[in-house]
Design a protein with these regions (language model features):
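N-terminal non-catalytic structural scaffold regions of very large proteins
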Residues: 1-218
Length: 218
């Protein structure tokens, strides 16, 4: 007998499988990929959130069918999600590959030429950087409120004295576009959050950026 939460993840995996099914039209597969991620976000927000609350309460709550504790369920969910993330990444690459012949391509910064990199740096400086606000977490500056489903760049910074700080930069903004055209390549785009992450060191010139990543809160 399968745990209810793990059973739901299996259901959502079937949605993901449709996104990777070559027999399904490409537009529908993109829709299935979007539905899969939206479902997973809601699952973590509601059901995993409830399990985490139960763990915080210190009360041992067991699931009726399998007798699993909240902690056991969360561990099992995380493991299952890691496996699904690998599958999702492979399907994403497959979908992106099929979009290229149709004139649509998402590109990473490291795939750009030096000239293209300079063009995007100018775009970042003029069109994006003025609208970004960095939050450095410290005892004097408490952890900021993170909005549900918004994208954030996070960084681990090191001061000249060797101390570490954490920084959070909201990347979701109605002022600048999320899809940035690469002017030298027709139909080629970059996500604004990828550009922000690449040029993150420009925002922290008095620090060394030791690590950086993108996160999204659910």
């Amino acid at each position: 007998m399968m745990n209810r939460e793990l059973s739901w993840l299996k259901f959502n995996e079937r949605v993901l499988n449709e996104a990777g099914n070559p027999a399904v039209p490409l537009a529908e597969r993109l829709t299935f990929a979007s539905i899969y991620q939206s479902n997973l976000d809601e699952f973590y927000r509601v059901r995993v959130g409830t399990l985490m609350d139960q763990m915080e309460s210190k009360e041992v709550v067991r699931e009726n069918k399998t007798n699993m504790t909240s902690e056991q369920q969360v561990k099992a969910i995380l493991q299952e999600t890691r496996d699904l993330d690998q599958k999702k990444a492979a399907i994403y690459e497959q979908l992106m590959g099929e979009l290229e012949p149709k004139g649509i391509r998402l590109i990473n910064f490291n795939k750009l030429s030096a000239e293209e990199g300079k063009l995007l740096e100018t775009y970042f400086d003029n069109e994006i950087a003025p609208y970004l606000s960095a939050n450095i977490v410290s005892k004097q500056q408490p952890f900021p409120f993170l909005k549900n489903k918004d994208i954030y760049a996070v960084a681990l910074l090191e001061t000249k004295g060797g101390k570490t700080r954490a920084a959070i930069i909201p990347c979701s903004n109605n002022v600048f576009r999320r899809l940035i055209d690469i002017p030298t390549r027709k139909g080629t785009f970059m996500l604004s959050e990828e550009l922000i992450l690449h040029f993150l060191p420009k925002m922290f010139k008095n620090y060394v950026v030791k690590e950086k990543s993108l996160i999204r809160v659910t």
